[in-house]
UniProtKB/Swiss-Prot annotation:
Key word rRNA-binding present: no
Highest taxon, organism lineage: Eukaryota
Function description: Part of the subtelomeric hrmA-associated cluster (HAC) containing genes that alter the hyphal surface (such as reduced total chitin or increased beta-glucan exposure) and perturb inter-hyphal interactions within the developing biofilms, resulting in a loss of vertically aligned polarized growing filaments. Consequently, this hypoxia-typic morphotype (called H-MORPH) with altered biofilm architecture leads to increased hypoxia fitness, increased host inflammation, rapid disease progression, and mortality in a murine model of invasive aspergillosis.
Record's compositionally biased regions (Basic and acidic residues): 180-189, 300-325
GO biological process per UniProt: cell adhesion
Any Pfam family hit: AFUB_07903_YDR124W_hel
Stretches for region Disordered: 163-190, 298-351, 427-451, 525-559
Low complexity bias (residue ranges): 169-179
InterPro entries: AFUB_07903/YDR124W-like_hel (IPR047092), AFUB_079030/YDR124W-like (IPR021264)
Protein name: Subtelomeric hrmA-associated cluster protein AFUA_5G14920
Length: 559
């Protein structure tokens, strides 16, 4: 409840309530804070109307012509709207199924308004101002409520409208070409206004086009909403000759109160119907054109004004859906133009890393070498994934991100060696301290069995990432040179291992002689055939080795 309007009158009491008319003829109320704390008001709508009725001719107020069920002057033969619904097909009814003598017989339930109401006078003979009042009041009633009320009114006025007056224009005329639809304007009922297109109230805002060069979308939306308001005002004011009375429309509006977004706004329609009754008296010549009707000045309270009266929430969702449909081709083209790496990242459900590698002067190298992992840091904390961008597409275009078989998560380039080549040790090609200190050696993360040779060359072929040697001749030759510098004998290898600076433990020297050949075979793995391991000694000198640590069993005689 809003705060009361204070006046210059100083009331020396703690509890009070006052109703008055100011110098402008506006109805005002004032209540003490003790009453306002209860979120209620003493001056309900009935009290305010009674106050104006008592003043009567002094303020030019006429009581509303609403008959209630407890009115002793109501005729006994009067029937309500609910009683006449079952008798619509009776011959006594008019052509639109409503008898003109039906009276409004149910009491209108009105919620109490706030403690302070600003009311203004409306001259009933000033038709443009009266029409403007109808339009402004229905805007505060909200468009979503207007659609609901309109559908209920149309169903009451024309119960079989889809059969008699379809919105789609009905069947096309005889001899029409295939695909031609009927004209909705030709099936428009007689009571429908001529300046409103024959559309269902939910679709009056559609089927409007404008010049794309002119930004008139908001104006087009406003015009369609005005058409809906024009249809509602026409039904309220111009259907008396078809047997539709204001009392019937008011009762129908209260019947669909629960379907409104804000049932309390129904009091706006009650005031509209009250003004319409006085306007009917003016049309019949019962009152003069100077008759003043006091209505609520809703424009003075901007908080009550519906900011979405012109564009309701349903219309906003439909506009967003239309914009989304227009954006689909753009998104589809952008998706097709992305790099292969971004597509692979989207396929695995993870974002590709967009952080550049620090490659120094070798930025043009086709196969950039990642930095060696430092176990003094926590690599997991540095795993930051960002959405893929095309900024570094040139650096990552020829590099495939490795993926473990057990998970679909991508491994960053800084963790490639730590994730797959954890047993790989850097070869020492020179004894100069500048070259040896350039590479950081990583200790063996776990103790392996003595039956396996823990030493593997640096350039071990990664079967997860096939490499085309023709694209990087300089890199391939440098790795082959490094391989040729290692001795192939088991004696030299066993003697040099304790003196290497790679941090490997001193393995037992008393291993079986049948396993000495393992040091000459390099990296080994199965080719997929369990009974036929591949011997790397039968391959080319610089090709990647294949086989299995148990491949020494092939020297045994077959049974």
């Amino acid at each position: 409840m809003g705060l009361c309007v204070r006046s210059s009158i100083n009331i020396p009491y703690f509890h009070y309530a006052m109703i008055y008319l100011d110098n402008m003829g506006r109805l005002k109320v004032m209540e003490s804070p003790s009453i306002q704390e209860q979120n209620e008001t003493v001056f309900t709508t009935e009290v305010r109307e009674r106050f104006l009725e008592i003043l009567g001719a002094k303020v030019g107020y006429q009581p509303p012509m609403v008959r209630s069920i407890y009115d002793p002057q109501q005729p006994l033969g009067c029937l309500s709207y609910r009683q006449t619904k079952r008798d619509r097909n009776s011959p006594a009814h008019s052509m639109y199924g409503v008898p003109p003598s039906v009276q409004f017989s149910a009491p209108v339930e009105e919620s109490p308004s706030c403690g302070s109401v600003d009311m203004v006078g409306l001259e009933i003979g000033d038709t443009p101002n009266v029409l403007d009042y109808y339009e402004r009041s229905l805007k505060h009633f909200r468009q979503v409520n207007c659609r609901q009320i309109l559908k209920t009114f149309i169903k009451f006025i024309e119960p079989r409208k889809q059969a008699k007056h379809p919105y789609n224009g009905g069947k096309p005329p005889a001899g029409a070409p295939p695909g031609k639809k009927g004209d909705p304007e030709k099936t428009k009922p007689e009571w429908w206004p001529a300046n409103v297109v024959h559309k269902e109230p939910d679709h009056l805002r559609k089927d409007r086009t404008c010049n794309p060069s002119e930004n008139l979308q908001c104006q087009v939306t406003l015009l369609t909403d005005l058409e809906r308001l024009s249809l509602l005002i026409h039904i309220i004011r111009r259907l008396g000759r078809f047997g539709i009375t204001t009392d019937q429309l008011q009762e129908i509006a209260h019947d669909c109160k629960r379907r409104l977004s804000d049932p309390h706004k129904l009091q706006i329609l009650d005031e509209v119907f009250r003004v319409r009754r006085i306007e009917e008296r003016y049309e019949r010549g019962e009152v003069d054109a100077n008759k003043i009707v006091y209505v609520v000045n809703r424009e003075s309270n901007q908080k009550e004004k519906d900011g979405d009266s012109n564009v309701d929430p349903d219309q906003k969702h439909e506009q967003e859906d239309d914009n989304a449909r227009e954006a689909l081709p753009i998104l589809h083209s952008e998706k097709n133009s992305t790099s292969p790496m971004s597509n692979s990242a989207e396929h695995t459900g993870m974002a590709a890393p967009s952080r550049p590698m620090n490659m120094g002067g070798d930025r043009n190298q086709l196969f950039p070498l990642p930095e060696w992992p430092s176990f003094g840091e926590t690599p997991q904390d540095d795993r930051i994934f960002f959405p893929t961008t095309s900024k570094y597409t040139e650096d990552y275009a020829s590099q495939q991100m490795p993926r473990t078989p057990a998970t679909t998560a991508l491994v960053s380039t800084n963790e490639t060696h730590a994730a797959f080549d954890y047993m790989t040790q850097e070869s020492i090609t020179s004894s100069s301290p500048e070259q040896t200190s350039h590479h950081r050696q990583a200790p063996l993360p776990m103790q392996h069995s003595a039956s396996l040779d823990p030493w593997t060359p640096t350039f071990r072929h990664n079967f997860f990432n096939p490499m085309v040697y023709s694209t990087a001749p300089r890199h391939a030759m440098s790795q082959a040179t490094m391989l040729s510098q290692f001795p192939r004998s088991t004696t030299s290898h066993g003697q040099e291992m304790p003196h290497m600076a790679h941090g490997l433990p001193n393995l037992p020297q008393d291993r079986p002689s049948s396993m000495d050949g393992m040091s000459m075979r390099g990296p080994s793995f199965r080719t997929g055939f369990l009974s036929h391991p591949c011997d790397p000694s039968q391959q080319a000198p610089h090709s990647s080795g294949c086989g299995h640590p148990d491949s020494w069993t092939q020297n045994r005689p077959h049974v």
